[in-house]
Design a protein with these regions (language model features):
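Short acidic, hydrophobic short linear motifs in intrinsically disordered regions
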Residues: 24-33
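Glycine-centered, phosphate/nucleic-acid-interacting loop/turn motifs that mediate DNA/RNA or nucleotide
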Residues: 56
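Short beta-strand "wing" residues that participate in macromolecule-binding interfaces
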Residues: 60
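Short helix-coil junctions and helix-kink-helix linkers
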Residues: 32-40
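Short alpha-helical segments that sit at the start of domains
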Residues: 1-17, 21, 77-78, 126
Length: 127
């Protein structure tokens, strides 16, 4: 992602719907997909779609009276940027402190613990 795009919490909800889709979606389809999760009016969803398009996070194409929206930024790129922002804001950029906090305060399955150990062992072996 060449340009930094700041996405609000509400906009993340819309982006998750579009990232999960296999093709472009109309505003009505996005509204329907969010209906089970959010009690937003159609106008609110359309406002969020317009904001995301203005920011460059979404592309759209008008076919007749219908606008079809698709992501222009990858989920991973947005998640990476948001993760860096969270790390800086909450933990002052200290990744180790963040990891310790989450490991101590998050229930983990034995499989997740094993995966964390594997990752940390790999970090120790690097110069």
């Amino acid at each position: 992602m060449a340009k930094t795009i700041n996405i609000s919490d509400a906009e993340w909800e819309v982006m998750h719907v579009l990232w999960s889709a296999s093709a472009a979606m109309s505003a009505s389809q996005v509204i329907d997909a969010l209906a089970g999760r959010k009690s937003w009016s159609p106008r609110t969803v359309k406002t969020l779609l317009n904001r995301l398009a203005t920011k460059g996070a979404l592309g759209f194409e008008a076919i007749g009276k219908t606008y079809w929206y698709r992501p222009r930024v990858a989920r991973d790129a947005c998640a990476k940027r948001e993760g860096r922002s969270f790390l800086a804001r909450v933990f002052g950029g200290d990744g180790g402190a963040m990891l310790v906090h989450f490991v101590k305060n998050t229930p983990l399955t034995p499989r997740e613990v094993a995966e964390l150990k594997r990752i940390l062992d790999g970090k120790e072996k690097r110069p």
